[in-house]
């Protein structure tokens, strides 16, 4: 029968040390911001903010078309913020069971289609809802322009998301080194 050792080395830790380790693991990946996906998401956030800020500064609640534009712009802006933070802090790697390339492709295609409808609604309603040369007219026209730009940005993201989903132009080594968002 083996004897029980007289000396046992133990190591204790406090709960604060464990919490500190999980907070330090949540560091931003600045390589993501320099990637195509990160740059396009930042562009979508800036342009989307311009769209809904310009519309929100007019009496949009009087016209249903602008209610739709506001819904699309704010909803997609918020979802893009969530996705941007998931990728910035590499939280998508912790949720490995989610097929992120497929999720991004579906989101970007849906966002493109929604922004197409918002752009058409916004630009078609400019002349009908305000007098040419007035401040609301200029804001709504500018919102139409930025809605077109953000629609193009989501379209480009949809194209790159489709390529990432299909695995076009990458191999296992480069996609691992680039963190999956080359």
Curated annotation (Swiss-Prot):
Annotated MARVEL domain ranges read 32-166
A GO term for molecular function: identical protein binding
Q: Which processes are annotated in GO (biological process)?
A: monoatomic ion transport; myelin assembly; myelination; regulation of endocytosis; regulation of transcytosis
Topological domain spans for side Cytoplasmic: 1-35, 90-99, 163-182
Annotated membrane-spanning segments are: 36-56, 69-89, 100-120, 142-162
Q: How is it modified after translation?
A: Phosphorylated.
Q: How does it sit in the membrane?
A: Multi-pass membrane protein
Residues in compartment: Extracellular: 57-68, 121-141
Keywords, alphabetical? Cell membrane, Golgi apparatus, Membrane, Phosphoprotein, Transmembrane, Transmembrane helix
Which GO cellular component term is one of those annotated?
apical plasma membrane
Q: Where in the cell is it found?
A: Cell membrane; Myelin membrane; Apical cell membrane; Golgi apparatus
Which residues carry the post-translational modification Phosphoserine, per the record?
A: 9
- Which PROSITE patterns does this chain map to? MARVEL (PS51225)
* PANTHER family, per the entry: MARVEL-CONTAINING POTENTIAL LIPID RAFT-ASSOCIATED PROTEIN, PLASMOLIPIN
Q: Which family does it belong to?
A: Belongs to the MAL family.
Assembly behavior: Forms oligomers.
Cited function: Main component of the myelin sheath that plays an important role in myelin membrane biogenesis and myelination. Plays an essential function in apical endocytosis. Regulates epithelial development through the regulation of apical endocytosis. Part of the intracellular machinery that mediates basolateral-to-apical transport of ICAM-1, an essential adhesion receptor in epithelial cells, from the subapical compartment in hepatic epithelial cells.
In its UniProt entry, what is this protein called?
Plasmolipin
Question: What is the originating organism of this protein?
Answer: Homo sapiens (Human)
Organism lineage string: Eukaryota, Metazoa, Chordata, Craniata, Vertebrata
């Amino acid at each position: 029968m083996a004897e029980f050792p007289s000396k046992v080395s133990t190591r204790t830790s406090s709960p604060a040390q464990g919490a500190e380790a999980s907070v330090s693991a949540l560091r931003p990946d600045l390589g993501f911001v320099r990637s195509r996906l990160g740059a396009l998401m930042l562009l979508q956030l800036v342009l989307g903010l311009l769209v809904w800020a310009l519309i929100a500064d007019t009496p949009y609640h009087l016209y249903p078309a602008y209610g739709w534009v506001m819904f699309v712009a704010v909803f997609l802006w918020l979802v893009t913020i969530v996705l941007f933070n998931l990728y910035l802090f590499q939280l998508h790697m912790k949720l490995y069971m989610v097929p992120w390339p497929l999720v991004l492709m579906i989101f970007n295609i849906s966002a493109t289609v929604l922004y197409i409808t918002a752009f058409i609604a916004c630009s078609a309603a400019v002349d009908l809802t305000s007098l040419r040369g007035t401040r609301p007219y200029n804001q709504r026209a500018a919102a139409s322009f930025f809605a077109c730009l953000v629609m193009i940005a989501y379209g480009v993201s949809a194209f790159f998301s489709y390529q990432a989903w299909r695995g076009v132009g990458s191999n296992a080594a480069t996609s691992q080194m680039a963190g999956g968002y080359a």
